[in-house]
Amino acid sequence: EEYSTMPVKNFSSVGAFSFPTCHFTGNIHIGRFCSIASNVKIMGGNHPLNRFTTHMMTYNGEFDKFAKSEFERSWTLKPFITKPENPIIGNDVWIGNDVVLKGGIAIGDGAVIAANSVVTKDVPPYAIVAGVPAKIIRFRFDSNVIDELLRIKWWNYNYSDLPDNNKCDDINYFVEEMNRLISNGNIQEMDYKKFNLSEIFRDL
């Protein structure tokens, strides 16, 4: 989307006003208004744990070719999916330095991941997690406020139309004002433009 920054050396799906400063491998979905620090990484490929070996010899086609060329024998392979899906990062997510994310997990809206954490499971919305493996330390707000924020989805609006920023640390004021603005029709969702950079560069 417009007003976003693309991760270093990679094309990804990045929402408006998100600023990843790290190098992600492969396409990854990042929501709006995210702050992602340097050296955040995604775990490498999987290996089978329930086979006699974790080695790639049981599923990598090169080992069948090698067996035929060197030993004049065939080597039966059993399929194994080594690369999981990339993580999905929600909106208003803050990820600290040197965090490692497991593939296929979902980071909920408003979540915070402390620096040096290793995240192996989904992170609920507005949870603050830390550690190896990462565990929930606390939530940013109480459950009622979280439910309201997830319903309001403030990141879908132009930030300059949001309630008085001088009171941005009063979450109850923010929720009440957003509900008032929405119910009165005084705030409209922002239609951010989307760009496909691979198509743009291909057409140059």
Residue map of PLM features:
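HATPase_c (GHKL) ATP-binding subdomain of two-component histidine kinases
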Residues: 95, 121, 130
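Acidic, glycine-centered active-site loop in nucleotide-sugar glycosyltransferases
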Residues: 125, 130-133
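C-terminal segments of enzyme domains that contribute to small-molecule binding surfaces
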Residues: 57-101, 133-204
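Non-catalytic N-terminal targeting/anchoring module and adjacent flexible stem/linker
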Residues: 1, 108, 202-204
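Flexible, glycine/small-residue-enriched loop-and-beta-strand segment within the central core
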Residues: 3-105
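A generic "structured core" feature
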Residues: 94, 108, 112-114, 118
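Conserved catalytic-core motifs of eukaryotic protein kinase domains, centered on the activation segment
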Residues: 46, 123, 139-140
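Conserved catalytic segment of ABC-fold P-loop ATPases
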Residues: 108-109, 124-126
